[in-house]
Amino acid sequence: FSQSAFPNSHHTSSSFSSFLEKFSEPSYSDILKMICPITLYYNYHKKYNFGNLHLNTRYYGKTYSATDSDLSEEAQRLLKLIPNEKDQRNAAQKHTYSRLIYQRRNKIAHEFYAVGLSLNFQEDRENQLPHIVLSHEFIGEDLIPGHWELNIPEQFTTSVFLSAIKGYLSYCEQNQILPFKPESERAYRFSWYDK
C-alpha cells in the first residue's frame, strides 16, 4: 500500500513512514512523527560530541513514554547540537518512531533478527506506546545505571498498521481510486532489470 500511496518516493523508507504517518489515526500519527532522543543520541553522540543525555538516571526502572515532554525537549536539544541544518533535518527524519518501526521491520525481514528483547510493554497501561527504559546492572552490591533502551511494543505496531491500512482504504474509497498500482507498474516486475 505504501508504494501505491507514495509512488514518487525514491526511498522505500520514506514511502513506508509517510504512509503510516498520513493514514493512521491522529493519536498514532502524532507519536510516529516524534523524534526518539535515545536512538538519535547513540547514533550521533561521538560524531557531534553530545556529552551526556539530560534525562533522569536516579531511579531504577525509570521509564519515559514517547509522549513525555522530557523526551521531546531532549530530542530538540540534541538536534541543535548538530551544526549543519541539512544534517539536523536528516537526523530528525531518521529517528522518528515511524522510521524506527521501518528499521525494525528490515532487521526482522532481511536480517532474520530475533526480536527476543526484554519485556517491551508498560505495566498498568491499556494503550501500549513506544517508551524508553534505563537499564541497570549490579557491580558488587551497587546498582549502576547502564544504557537507555527503546521499546516499541508489538501491540502498538500492530495497532498502527491496522489503523493506517483502514485509513488508506477509506481514503481510496472516498476518492474512488484503486488501492494498488496497476499490476504492470509494480516495482517487483522490473527487479531483474536496471532502470
What are these model-predicted stretches?
Residues A5-N8, Y28-D30, Y48-L53, H131-I139, ...:
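Short, charged low-complexity intrinsically disordered segments located at boundaries
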Residues S17-E21, T39-K46, P145-V160:
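Short, surface-exposed, charge-dense and proline/glycine-enriched linear segments
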Residues F1-N8, Y102:
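Short, hydrophobic, well-ordered secondary-structure elements
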Residues H11-S14, C36, H54-L55, Y59, ...:
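Alpha-helical structural elements
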Residues A5-S18, S118-F121:
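Short acidic alpha-helical/loop segments enriched in Asp/Glu that coordinate divalent cations
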Residues L20-K107, E111-S118:
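Short, mixed-charge amphipathic alpha-helical segments
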